[in-house]
């Protein structure tokens, strides 16, 4: 039979030369067509082609090494049919040891060849690293930054670039897919990775410890089950059929084909939307970069703590259901700004009635008795929270803001701003390790309604530091911001610095407002002086906000303590019904 062309297998990955190409390994001799399976290596110069001596009694003359653009001088004589070289087995223990030694030397020569060959293009594969995979649970940073092809990825030895700094490298010369330790039900069946795949002794194959599928294909997008495309007509998995077949070190066909298929997926239009189904798991489907293998990630994306813009940009904003009950995500009160000046209440109601029953309101509507919103904005009070989500779906987003076209008698299709309130923006915990101390909490009055709790926390932490919690006060019925907030500090120094300033400039985006800062007053605190002994066990009505006091007092103790020199000008604070501390003037008897 004619010899294979030197360029027949050179179309593979440029950083990993083909093992079946004789141009790369001129020291190899073809296998004898007879029963002996040894390798014949020339011994000229004492080196023996890098192996150190002969390996077989059959001395077959090696073919001359082919060169670029130089045809072979003459075809080899016809030989009898022979078995494939990659699957021949030694007939004696001595020949078996010789075969293993030849394979080890071949690997060493191939690796040294790879290190001296320049790469023709950028490679997305990982570097050959020295540290190994950890056996513990994966860190959050690694899960968060995982690659969408991680289930089908494998390390390749050689000088190749690392695909992600968050991935842990492989150890030694063992090349294996990443091994995830998960307790999810989908991983309960027997793993497709055998127990001895990480062996590195002389009796194990260190090139590739498991048989890789030679044809890695992406299932159709509209298929009902990804697992169906991996099963044969008999109902058995192709991976299961090849599970016991270890990879032959002298046969690189399957590895080449697999890597070619994976590299072709680099330019696949479904990149980032659909991952390769991993054998041994139950249909690991990843849509929009989210996989069922990582339920922690999906939970964090849907727990309501994501950015508001991201929630508004989602295709469907409908509430989730938990235990048969719908979970509300938005307040039923929605701000509408930029209304036409001649639009009245009925026209506003007609413009938004298609989303659900609602009532139109604006500040001081009852007192002013006006039929038009005086300042060009109003509030929509929907009966159902699902109406708010339907309104959000109908809006147009631009620069992180939502708009909807509204018409008046003189203006047609005027874009008005729709500003819903996400309930998750009412609270933000910056440092969960610190307990919330009401004695280290401040009240912030006049907070702009678009300001979220996370933004309030960032501003206060930048000014005073030590912020562990921030909250926006909302009304109990509609859960809409009331224009006030609370900030809890983890230390007394930050708390005193904040209340000593009295006023803070809130700057964020379009917001630039000077607000007042006071101590957060509680209405269920006992007197710090008498502990209720002098007031019949009643709660203390007064709180002294001066930094020299910062205590709750009953009426008797207040008069007693603040009659001293230097404290007669202290002014007590009391809590109003709307969670707002009010300053009063204490009258001396």
Curated annotation (Swiss-Prot):
Residues 44-53 have a biased composition (Gly residues). It is found in: Cytoplasm. One of its GO terms (biological process) is negative regulation of cytoplasmic translational elongation. Keywords: Cytoplasm, Phosphoprotein, Repeat, RNA-binding, Translation regulation. SMART domains: RRM (SM00360). CDD domains: Bbox1 (cd19757), RRM1_CPEB2_like (cd12724), RRM2_CPEB2_like (cd12726). GO terms for molecular function: GTPase inhibitor activity; mRNA 3'-UTR AU-rich region binding; mRNA 3'-UTR binding; mRNA regulatory element binding translation repressor activity; ribosomal large subunit binding; ribosomal small subunit binding; ribosome binding; RNA binding. One of its GO terms (cellular component) is neuron projection. Pfam families: CEBP_ZZ (PF16366), RRM_7 (PF16367). Residues 332-423, 440-522 form the RRM domain. The modification Phosphoserine is found at residue 89. May play a role in translational regulation of stored mRNAs in transcriptionally inactive haploid spermatids. Binds to poly(U) RNA oligomers. Required for cell cycle progression, specifically for the transition from metaphase to anaphase. Belongs to the RRM CPEB family. PANTHER family: CYTOPLASMIC POLYADENYLATION ELEMENT BINDING PROTEIN CPEB, CYTOPLASMIC POLYADENYLATION ELEMENT-BINDING PROTEIN 2. Interacts with TENT2/GLD2. This is Cytoplasmic polyadenylation element-binding protein 2. The lineage of its organism: Eukaryota, Metazoa, Chordata, Craniata, Vertebrata.
């Amino acid at each position: 039979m004619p010899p294979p062309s030197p360029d027949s297998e050179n179309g593979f990955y440029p950083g990993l030369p083909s093992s079946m190409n004789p141009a790369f390994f001129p020291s190899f001799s073809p296998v004898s067509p007879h029963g002996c399976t040894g390798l014949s290596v020339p011994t000229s110069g004492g080196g023996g082609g890098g192996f150190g001596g002969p390996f077989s009694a059959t001395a077959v003359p090696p073919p001359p090494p082919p060169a670029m653009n130089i045809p072979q001088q003459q075809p080899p004589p016809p030989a009898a049919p022979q078995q494939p070289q990659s699957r021949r087995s030694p007939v004696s223990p001595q020949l078996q040891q010789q075969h293993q030694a030849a394979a080890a030397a071949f690997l060493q020569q191939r690796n040294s060849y790879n290190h001296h060959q320049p790469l023709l293009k950028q490679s997305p594969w990982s570097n050959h690293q020295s540290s190994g995979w950890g056996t513990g649970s994966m860190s959050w940073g690694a899960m968060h930054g995982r690659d969408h092809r991680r289930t089908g990825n494998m390390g390749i030895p050689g000088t190749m670039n690392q695909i992600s700094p968050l991935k842990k490298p492989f150890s030694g010369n063992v090349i294996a897919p990443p091994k995830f330790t998960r307790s999810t039900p989908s991983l309960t069946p027997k793993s497709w990775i055998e127990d001895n795949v990480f062996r590195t002794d002389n009796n194990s194959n260190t090139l590739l410890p498991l048989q890789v599928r030679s044809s890695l294909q992406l299932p159709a997008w509209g298929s009902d089950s990804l697992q169906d495309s991996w099963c044969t007509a008999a109902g058995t998995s192709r991976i299961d059929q090849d599970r016991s077949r270890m990879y032959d070190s002298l046969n690189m066909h399957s590895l080449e084909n697999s890597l070619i298929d994976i590299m072709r997926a680099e330019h696949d239009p479904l990149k980032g939307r659909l991952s390769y189904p991993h054998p041994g798991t139950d249909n690991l489907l990843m849509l929009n970069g989210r996989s069922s293998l990582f339920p922690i990630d999906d939970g964090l994306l849907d727990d309501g703590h994501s950015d508001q813009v991201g929630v508004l940009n989602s295709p469907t904003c409908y509430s989730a259901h938990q235990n048969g009950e719908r979970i509300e995500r938005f307040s039923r009160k929605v701000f509408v700004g930029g209304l036409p000046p001649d639009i009245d209440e009925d026209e506003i109601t007609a413009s938004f009635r298609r989303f659900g029953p609602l009532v139109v309101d604006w500040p001081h509507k009852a007192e002013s008795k006006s039929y038009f919103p005086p300042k060009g904005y109003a509030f929509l009070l929907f009966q159902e929270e699902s109406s708010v989500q339907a309104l959000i779906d109908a809006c147009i987003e631009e620069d992180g803001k939502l708009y909807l076209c509204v018409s008046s008698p003189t203006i047609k299709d005027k874009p008005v701003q729709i500003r819903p309130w996400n309930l998750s923006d009412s609270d933000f915990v910056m440092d969960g390790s610190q307990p919330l101390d009401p004695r280290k909490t401040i009240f912030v009055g006049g907070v702009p309604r678009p300001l979220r709790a996370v933004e309030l926390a960032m501003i206060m932490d930048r000014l005073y530091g030590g912020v562990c919690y921030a909250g926006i006060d909302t009304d109990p019925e509609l859960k809409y911001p009331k224009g006030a907030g609370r900030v809890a500090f983890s230390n007394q120094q930050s708390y005193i610095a904040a209340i000593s300033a009295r006023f803070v400039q809130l700057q964020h985006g379009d917001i630039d407002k000077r607000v007042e800062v006071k101590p957060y007053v509680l209405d269920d605190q006992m007197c710090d002086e008498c502990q209720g002994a002098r007031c019949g066990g009643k709660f203390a009505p007064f709180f002294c906000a001066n930094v020299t006091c910062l205590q709750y007092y009953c009426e008797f103790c207040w008069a007693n303590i603040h009659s001293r020199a230097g404290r007669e000008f202290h002014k007590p604070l009391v809590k109003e019904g709307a969670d707002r501390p009010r300053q009063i003037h204490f009258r001396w008897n």
